[in-house]
Amino acid sequence: MTLTTPLSITAIVPAAGVGSRMKADRPKQYLLLNGKTVLEHTIEQLLAFPLVNKVVVAITDGDPYFPELTLAHDSRVIRVSGGKERADSVLSGLSYVQEHQLSEWVMVHDAARPCIRHSDIDKLIAEVIPEHIGGILASPVRDTMKHATQEQCIETTIDRSVLWHALTPQLFTTELLFSALQTGLEQNLSITDESSAIELMGYQPKLVQGRADNLKITQPEDLDLAEFYLQKMKKETK
């Protein structure tokens, strides 16, 4: 297997956000879970996956926390400069991947999703790579969904059967995602995740159902839930 085969994947982790909703003294990716930071859990899960050759982490310039982590000195972990928005950070990571010809496929994963399971990544790769475009892990919406007015009143009920929660990882060819993000940023388009950039180019990325416990830590109460899931995952691997 060579570095440029589809069986070699580079993970990109945008980790330049501040996580203001957590109301913590540091960005949420550096909060502790079971003795390690959220970011350490996330990166370790990615590095342990056999097909991931490198993890490219986009960090804010001057970030005082990342250099203190043990994994910051791991040769498989590459730091690049993060940007103001998520798309800028991912594009920075993609530039490194292309410049060094690391892989034809990239897998973008949220820094604040430490509970990703290898079984979900296996499923994503198996269903997406034959399509030659890309796709994302996602979870079908379970709750009844309401469309609100500006006054925060219910305007109508939305058919949830066609709605999915977008998760990560999101897996695309390096060249296509680079082109999509670069074009979207140049045109000042709204890019909320990698798949939205691909959609703006006229493609339809595949939805691959993943586990709902692959949560993104956003609110303070999410930390306890993530800690529970991580402990459960640890017991299952024993």
UniProtKB/Swiss-Prot annotation:
Q: What is its EC number?
A: 2.7.7.60
Q: Name one Pfam family in it.
A: IspD
Residues the record annotates as the site (Positions MEP for the nucleophilic attack) are R160, K216
Show the InterPro entries listed in the entry.
Answer: IspD, IspD/TarI, IspD/TarI_cytidylyltransf_bact, ISPD_synthase_CS, Nucleotide-diphossugar_trans
Keywords noted in UniProt: Isoprene biosynthesis, Nucleotidyltransferase, Transferase
Q: Where is this site: Transition state stabilizer?
A: R21, K28
Does the keyword section mention Hydrolase?
no
Single GO MF annotation: 2-C-methyl-D-erythritol 4-phosphate cytidylyltransferase activity
- Reactions performed catalytically: 2-C-methyl-D-erythritol 4-phosphate + CTP + H(+) = 4-CDP-2-C-methyl-D-erythritol + diphosphate
The answer, when asked if Nucleotidyltransferase is one of the entry's keywords, is: yes
> What pathway annotation does it carry?
Isoprenoid biosynthesis; isopentenyl diphosphate biosynthesis via DXP pathway; isopentenyl diphosphate from 1-deoxy-D-xylulose 5-phosphate: step 2/6
Q: For this chain's UniProt record, which GO biological process terms are given?
A: isopentenyl diphosphate biosynthetic process, methylerythritol 4-phosphate pathway
Disulfide-bonded cysteine pairs: these are none
Extract the NCBIfam families matched here.
ispD
Similarity-based family: Belongs to the IspD/TarI cytidylyltransferase family. IspD subfamily.
Q: What does this protein do?
A: Catalyzes the formation of 4-diphosphocytidyl-2-C-methyl-D-erythritol from CTP and 2-C-methyl-D-erythritol 4-phosphate (MEP).
Protein name per its UniProtKB record: 2-C-methyl-D-erythritol 4-phosphate cytidylyltransferase
Traced from the root, the source organism's taxonomic lineage reads: Bacteria, Pseudomonadati, Pseudomonadota, Gammaproteobacteria, Vibrionales
Query: Which gene carries the instructions for this protein?
Result: ispD
